[in-house]
Amino acid sequence: MALEQLGLGVSAVDGGENSSAPSNDGGDDGVKTARLPRWTRQEILVLIQGKRVAENRVRRGRAAGMALGSGQMEPKWASVSSYCKRHGVNRGPVQCRKRWSNLAGDYKKIKEWESQIKEETESYWVMRNDVRREKKLPGFFDKEVYDIVDGGVIPPAVPVLSLGLAPASDEGLLSDLDRRESPEKLNSTPVAKSVTDVIDKEKQEACVADQGRVKEKQPEAANVEGGSTSQEERKRKRTSFGEKEEEEEEGETKKMQNQLIEILERNGQLLAAQLEVQNLNLKLDREQRKDHGDSLVAVLNKLADAVAKIADKM
């Protein structure tokens, strides 16, 4: 179902997006905070898209975390809020979560009602607002938003590397070099009993030190090269990860645009059908009124004729 695909199973949150913040109880001024602005259709569409992107990131992060043991990930609603702000919707994580909760609850009610109706005349989209409220349905719900939520498709999660990988630090390499050189420093002080012994030992130590430095340079160079290679690989992986995210966002945006075009076309057809039905109803109403008027005139004429006949007899 579309409801399961979009992950609408969220806990209910008291209050909608238009509910004002709690007053300053116990304060001296008693001033209430400003009322939050209403969500526009475009903001809701960005919210839906941001939730899809955030859920994709969560799935990819979990897969990468199981494989590589990455660090903590950004909370889902904080990620949704960041996506919204990048696309011009300045809403916080709490606002996004509350608006989605209300949107999910209203969608479930409408979806359940539409699945139970037997005729198109009982559809939620044909009802007046007062009739909707009598049937405990949302007073208003945007048709385009409903169609996107109902027919939305989330792309499959692709396991990728997490951004939690940290590059190898230069301090670690330097500390390894210091540890390797420390034995030489400890053994570099010769103990001589005579000038000849000192000279011989210095020559021997110089030869040994040269050989040791040659041997040590080889693994050190290998370690440095290996560290730089791993850093480059991680940088390339992070770069490819960012490019994949951008491509996915572009693909989602194009998909949303195509869905909007299809929805607008369907809404136009539905509106044309509704106008045709209304015109037909008005035409039938006019014909009925005309028939009633003609019948009333005929009855009045007969009554006048009867009164005239009675007057003539008198």
UniProtKB/Swiss-Prot annotation:
Record motif EAR 2, residues: 280-284
Record bears the keyword Kinase: no
Effects seen without this gene: Enhanced disease resistance to virulent bacterial pathogen infection such as P.syringae pv tomato (Pst) DC3000 and P.syringae pv maculicola (Psm) ES4326 associated with immune gene activation.
Protein keywords: DNA-binding, Nucleus, Phosphoprotein, Plant defense, Repeat, Repressor, Transcription, Transcription regulation
Listed result of changing T189A: Phospho-inactive sequence variation. Blocked flg22-induced phosphorylation by MPK4 but normal transcriptional repressor activity. Enhanced disease resistance
GO biological-process terms attached to the record: cellular response to molecule of bacterial origin; defense response; negative regulation of DNA-templated transcription; negative regulation of immune response; regulation of DNA-templated transcription
PTM per Swiss-Prot/TrEMBL: Phosphorylated on Thr-189 by MPK4 in response to microbe-associated molecular patterns (MAMPs, e.g. flg22, elf18, chitin, and LPS). This phosphorylation enhances DNA-binding and thus negatively regulates immune gene expression.
Localization: Nucleus
Family annotation (Pfam families): Myb_DNA-bind_4
Effect recorded for T196A: Normal flg22-induced phosphorylation by MPK4
Motif (Nuclear localization signal): 84-91
Ranges of residues in domain Myb-like: 38-104
GO CC annotation terms, alphabetical: nucleus
GO molecular function: DNA binding; DNA-binding transcription factor activity; protein homodimerization activity
Main localization of the protein described in the UniProt heading: nucleus
InterPro entries: Myb_DNA-bind_4, SANT/Myb
Residue numbers of Phosphothreonine PTMs: T189
Region annotation Disordered: where it falls in the sequence: 1-34, 207-255
Domain notes: EAR motifs are involved in transcriptional repressor activity.
Function: Transcriptional repressor that binds DNA and plays a negative role in regulating microbe-associated molecular patterns-(MAMPs, e.g. flg22, elf18, chitin, and LPS) triggered immunity (PTI) by negatively regulating immune gene expression.
Subunit and interaction comment: Homodimer. Interacts directly with MPK4.
Designated name of the protein: Trihelix transcription factor ASR3
